[in-house]
Amino acid sequence: MTAPKAVVLVSGGLDSATVLAIAREQEFICHTLSFNYGQRHRVELQAAAEISRRMGAVEHKRITIDLGGFGGSALTDPSMAVPEASSGAIPITYVPARNTVFLSFALGWAEVLGAQDIFIGVNAVDYSGYPDCRPAFIKAFEHLAKLATCAGLEGRAFRIQAPLLHLSKAEIIREGMRLGIDYSRTISCYQADENGRACGVCDSCRFRKQGFWDAGVPDPTRYH
């Protein structure tokens, strides 16, 4: 029996690397997808390509889109500073509609490939308050995929796989260690320098640091 295909969204960060490892353990033939969307931390794209290669993806695509053309996010607008602490509200590092756009591209590629599974590393526990990281969003997009595609109309429903959705960062790291992931090669920082060194103070860095601490695992992140 031929192994099933899957499209896996890979950013170069800790969560998406873990998701790719999970998909590979489940014996999916993985096609990975990354985006240059105008983010200030584009060095993560190099990590995404390397992670995909090292972890056995059969194909890796990088799509260029300009989400920075709209502004509205500290990740794409250089005039907005990346905050060093959460305010309690939806943070300015939220990129409007980002996961909707990413999943739409993944859905298109999955339909072309004949894949029914799309993996994404969203997390609703240790996250920054992004609305497109919630279970309700994943469920709604899965329903949209059934309505908006030929495959869906023909009864070949798509599954949006979000295996990290209800895990803490520490639980994600422990799972990644079990799967043999080298987290030193991942980049999570919102403003990593050109060498991939993390700032250590943005939300993403703080969640990552705390996750390693809570997991009892030495943090392999390179900081500047």
Curated annotation (Swiss-Prot):
Keywords: ATP-binding, Ligase, Metal-binding, Nucleotide-binding, Queuosine biosynthesis, Zinc. Its EC number is 6.3.4.20. Binds 1 zinc ion per subunit. It catalyses: 7-carboxy-7-deazaguanine + NH4(+) + ATP = 7-cyano-7-deazaguanine + ADP + phosphate + H2O + H(+). GO terms for biological process: queuosine biosynthetic process. Pathway: Purine metabolism; 7-cyano-7-deazaguanine biosynthesis. The keyword Transit peptide does not apply. SUPFAM superfamilies: Adenine nucleotide alpha hydrolases-like. Its cofactor is Zn(2+). ATP binds at V10, S11, G12, G13, L14, D15, S16, A17, T18, V19, L20. Catalyzes the ATP-dependent conversion of 7-carboxy-7-deazaguanine (CDG) to 7-cyano-7-deazaguanine (preQ(0)). PANTHER family: 7-CYANO-7-DEAZAGUANINE SYNTHASE (PTHR42914:SF1). Belongs to the QueC family. This is 7-cyano-7-deazaguanine synthase. The lineage of its organism: Bacteria, Pseudomonadati, Pseudomonadota, Gammaproteobacteria, Chromatiales.
